[in-house]
Amino acid sequence: MTEFWLISAPGEKTCQQTWEKLMAATTKNNNLSTNAKFNIPDLKVGTLDVLVGLSDELAKLDAFVEGTVKKVAQYMADVLEDSRDKVQENLLANGVDLVTYITRFQWDMAKYPIKQSLKNISEIIAKGVTQIDNDLKARASAYNNLKGNLQNLERKNAGSLITRSLAEIVKKDDFVLDSEYLITLLVVVPKNNYNDWVKQYETLAEMVVPRSSNVLSEDQDSYLCNVTLFRKAVDDFRHKARENKFVVRDFQYNEEEMKADKEEMNRLSTDKKKQFGPLVRWLKVNFSEAFIAWIHVKALRVFVESVLRYGLPVNFQAMLLQPNKKTMKKLREVLYDLYKHLDSSAASIIDAPMDIPGLNLSQQEYYPYVYYKIDCNLLEFK
């Protein structure tokens, strides 16, 4: 997807002049970025102390909301399984794609009334996104359990004859049932050893019923054969079979159990289909809610940081840049030249990225203008 740089700079004589200067520097001759004004309404400023504290709180809230947005997006990809190419078309904000939403951002006055204090607005966002995060955990847990149980049953019916469930393969007629003396065993015979089996099975132990073995099924490597013998000879037969590389499966024909397993699999499969639609709808709705909340947090951060840096009265222009990937470094240099006068301590930062002890931000994250990255690459396909 796309990376955006959300920046702000103080108004020149007017905010429009600030905008025009940016456009001239980044788009006129060099096509460094695609830009849009980022509209932030007149929010309540409050006291300086509150703004300083809020700056730290908003940084944490930003990380939390971004994490929730990514979790919802990633879980949608997991739920859609084979349709992962369709994930992106389901990741919408307010019914439009994410790039459109960000570049045409309008503050949601109904959800986040600007008559409220900045702290109250941030608390409304935190409460809403925490609810989404908790609901996601509960819904994901329930759906994952269902999916896991179904996969376990499906796994039992897949794989080689040595490990898979045989319930779907055998029939009642393949067994001698309800006999006091006789029992039918199921034996996995490697294809390379099948001729040995035919010659030997009647003499592997005493009391094997002659000509009682048939091939019931096969896979790439083996045949599944039945054989009937007296119950008292079973242990001896198992031992001799193992010596000859024939694997006797532990299997008892039980129609009740087999029917119950089949019904359980059908039930789980039906439940999964029933839950799938509502779950995807919930993910779409709540992805949109979380993403919208995230961009409002970015707007709050730009507002607070701009007031702290540029002072009162509030006079700054927030601008959204979509950098051209090939010229990101050049764009940074142009922005630096444009705004280096705002902060003398920013001199040489562009050339010397390093960490300064005691500062939360590493040098490469600090610029003379207010800057926040919005990364719309929300999915990590495994």
From Swiss-Prot:
Transport among keywords: yes
GO molecular function, one term: proton-transporting ATPase activity, rotational mechanism
InterPro entries reported for this sequence: ATPase_V1-cplx_csu, Vac_ATP_synth_c_sf
Cited SUPFAM superfamilies: Vacuolar ATP synthase subunit C (SSF118203)
Coiled-coil residue spans: none
Subunit structure: V-ATPase is a heteromultimeric enzyme made up of two complexes: the ATP-hydrolytic V1 complex and the proton translocation V0 complex. The V1 complex consists of three catalytic AB heterodimers that form a heterohexamer, three peripheral stalks each consisting of EG heterodimers, one central rotor including subunits D and F, and the regulatory subunits C and H. The proton translocation complex V0 consists of the proton transport subunit a, a ring of proteolipid subunits c9c'', rotary subunit d, subunits e and f, and two accessory subunits.
Function noted in UniProt: Subunit of the V1 complex of vacuolar(H+)-ATPase (V-ATPase), a multisubunit enzyme composed of a peripheral complex (V1) that hydrolyzes ATP and a membrane integral complex (V0) that translocates protons. V-ATPase is responsible for acidifying and maintaining the pH of intracellular compartments and in some cell types, is targeted to the plasma membrane, where it is responsible for acidifying the extracellular environment. Subunit C is necessary for the assembly of the catalytic sector of the enzyme and is likely to have a specific function in its catalytic activity.
Name assigned to this protein: V-type proton ATPase subunit C 1
Native organism: Xenopus tropicalis (Western clawed frog)
